[in-house]
Amino acid sequence: LVDYQWDGQVKVITGIRRCGKSYLLRTLFKNYLLEHGVKKEQILSFELDLAKDIRFRNPLELSAYVREIVEPSAEQYYLFVDEIQMSDQVPNPYNVNGAPITFYDALNDLRSLPNLDVYVTGSNSKMLSKDILTQFRGRSDEVRVHPLSFSEFYSAVGGDKQGAFETYAFYGGMPLILSRPSDMAKMNCLKALFSEVFLKDI
């Protein structure tokens, strides 16, 4: 993400549910920005899966809100939109017979603001690479997030390397496994994730 800053594109962070996309954007990257002089007020963050931001599922609401803050200012701003697949399509208020307005339309528009850098996350079947390239009309960078590699997994757990590898080989590299202390908890966690992905994302 650091390398893609201010390249004029929408940065689209994709990957399977719970693989760490939101953590990468709203924790790791946000902390990096704050440590490098960006003020908290310069980071506009929305979580479309939470009730507090539900009105911003409407692309026109989000666009108007962001423009009201960014356009009059000389400051540089970062826009984070988490879980873009929760966004709505809305009727075109200027042409009732026209195509509905989508989040892609709003973000393509906001991307043109010279003092705004746009980042979004998404995790379902609508966020495939070919769809991203089509919907953003070539104005996006896809940043693909995968589950942890064994090297990343071992750097977190430490200890006996062979034992860590056996755990990794059996349970995989989903980051949330690291916080589950027992085998039963790990299994239940993976079952719940499977059900969530199957029901919500496929």
Please state what every model-predicted region is.
Residues 1-8:
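Pre-Walker A adenine-sensing motif
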Residues 13:
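Hydrophobic anchor at the beta1->P-loop junction of P-loop NTPases
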Residues 16:
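P-loop (Walker A) phosphate-binding loop of NTP-binding proteins
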Residues 22:
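Walker A/P-loop
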Residues 44-75:
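Short glycine-rich substrate-engagement loop in P-loop NTPases that contacts/grips substrate
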Residues 80, 85-119:
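Conserved Walker B catalytic segment
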Residues 125-141, 157-158:
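Short regulatory helix/loop adjacent to the ATP-binding pocket of P-loop NTPases
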Residues 147-202:
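Interdomain hinge/linker elements that couple catalytic modules in large macromolecular machines
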